[in-house]
Amino acid sequence: MEGRLNNMWRLTVNESKFVESALQSELRVDGRGLYDYRKLTIKFGKEYGSSQVQLGQTHVMAFVTAQLVQPYKDRPSEGSFSIFTEFSPMADPSFEPGHPGESAVELGRIIDRALRESRAVDTESLCVLAGKLVWSVRIDLHILDNGGNLVDAANVAALAALMTFRRPDCTVGGDNSQDVIIHPPEEREPLPLIIHHLPIAFTFGFFNKGSILVMDPTYVEEAVMCGRMTVTVNANGDICAIQKPGEEGVNQSVILHCLRLASSRASATTKIIRDAVEAYNRERSSQKVKRHHTLAKSEVLGPIVVV
C-alpha cells in the first residue's frame, strides 16, 4: 500500500522534511506521541452484522452475510469465511473504481490471515450437514474515508460486525435425516457466531531508515514512511500474525518492541469492542421487548378501525 500512496500522491519536499524533523523530536503533526493511538469509535447499523468504525479521520464500514454452501472436500465438517474489500474513489483520489486492486487484496489478506490462522472463529459450529451443507460467512469491507492506517480500522470493523452477526437457526429432519429446515427469525431466534478471541491488528510505520517507529500512522505519515509492519495479537498476549510488506528488513529488537507495544494496548482495544457490542445488544433487546409489548397490547385491544 505504500507504493500506491507514494506513486499517486506525494508531499512537497518541505512538508516531508517537516514531518521527519518533528518525528526526530518525538512529535507528530497531529499532536500525538510516537506510540499514541487515535480515538476509536464504533457504531452499528439496524441490521445484524453491520458496523462502522472511525479511527481518527479513517472511516470503514463492514457487513457480514452468510449462505449455505457445500463444504470443501478436505474440511467436510467445517464452514468457511471470506473477506472482500471495496475502495471507493470518494475515500481517496488514488483509489480506482472497478475490480479490487493490489492494495485491496492485501488489506483483506492481512485480516483474513489473522482470523484464520488464530482460529478466532469456530468454523466447526458452522456445519449443518457434514459433507453436504455448511455456512459460508462473507465479510464485506467498504473504505469510506482514508485517513491512514486502513488495516487497523478495517480489522476492528470486521470483528465488530462478526460479533453482532446472527445466522438463521437450522434443523435436520426428514425420513433419512437429510432434509435441512431454515427457521425464520420469527420462529426461532437467530444464532450468533462462536468467536473464541479477538485478534487485534496494530500497524507501525518506520521512518529515517527504520530508526524511528510510530504507531497508527496517518495518511500524511504513510506518504513519508519508508516501511510498515502490522502485528496482530489478542488480549491474552498471543501472537496471531505478523505482516511486513516491502523489501526493507527489520531488526529482531524492533519486532519485539512492536510486539510489546501491541500487547500492552490489545486489552484496551478489546474492551472498547466488547463494550460497544454489549451496548448494541442491550439496545436491541430493549427494542424487542417494547415491540412485543406493543404487539401484545394491540392483540388485547383488538384491531383499530379508522372511519
Curated annotation (Swiss-Prot):
GO molecular function: 3'-5'-RNA exonuclease activity; RNA binding
Pfam families per record: RNase_PH, RNase_PH_C
InterPro entries listed in its UniProt record: ExoRNase_PH_dom1 (IPR001247), ExoRNase_PH_dom2 (IPR015847), ExoRNase_PH_dom2_sf (IPR036345), Exosome_comp_Rrp42_subfam (IPR050590), PNPase/RNase_PH_dom_sf (IPR027408), Ribosomal_Su5_D2-typ_SF (IPR020568), Rrp45 (IPR033100)
Expression tissues: Expressed in roots, leaves, stems, buds and siliques.
Disruption phenotype annotation: No visible phenotype under normal growth conditions.
Predominant place of localization: cytoplasm
PANTHER family attached to this UniProt entry: EXOSOME COMPLEX COMPONENT RRP45, EXOSOME COMPLEX EXONUCLEASE RIBOSOMAL RNA PROCESSING PROTEIN
Listed name of the protein: Exosome complex component RRP45A
